[in-house]
């Protein structure tokens, strides 16, 4: 079953990022920050390390790791995650 994530509300984004990161567990791999164009909200999700896993991405920034390289920016209006992992669904 696929769960779809849209951008969180701007005022909740940082708190949700921290809570979700703890809940999902930090695997030590570089996480990906995905930015939504409309609200400017970001979501940091250790499970999404590849832009191809998301159906539409505004911009992704690679954080962590030694190189700190940026992933290519893709133009889009709405951010929707389509992941197979059921643990990522909102409660």
From Swiss-Prot:
Keywords: Nucleus, Transcription, Transcription regulation. This is Transcription factor znf27. Transcription factor; part of the gene cluster 27 that mediates the biosynthesis of asparasone A, a sclerotium-specific anthraquinone pigment important for sclerotial survival. Controls the expression of the non-reducing polyketide synthase (NRPKS) pks27. Its main location: nucleus. Induction: Expression is induced by the developmental and secondary metabolism regulator veA. It is found in: Nucleus. Disruption phenotype: Impairs the production of asparasone A. One of its GO terms (cellular component) is nucleus.
């Amino acid at each position: 079953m696929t769960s779809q994530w849209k951008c969180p509300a701007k005022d909740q984004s940082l708190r949700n990022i921290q809570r979700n990161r703890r809940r999902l567990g930090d695997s030590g791999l570089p996480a990906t920050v995905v930015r939504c164009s409309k609200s400017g909200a970001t979501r940091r999700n250790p499970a999404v390390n590849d832009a191809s896993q998301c159906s539409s991405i505004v911009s992704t920034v690679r954080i962590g790791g030694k190189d700190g390289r940026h992933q290519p920016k893709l133009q889009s209006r709405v951010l929707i995650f389509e992941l197979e992992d059921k643990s990522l669904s909102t409660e």
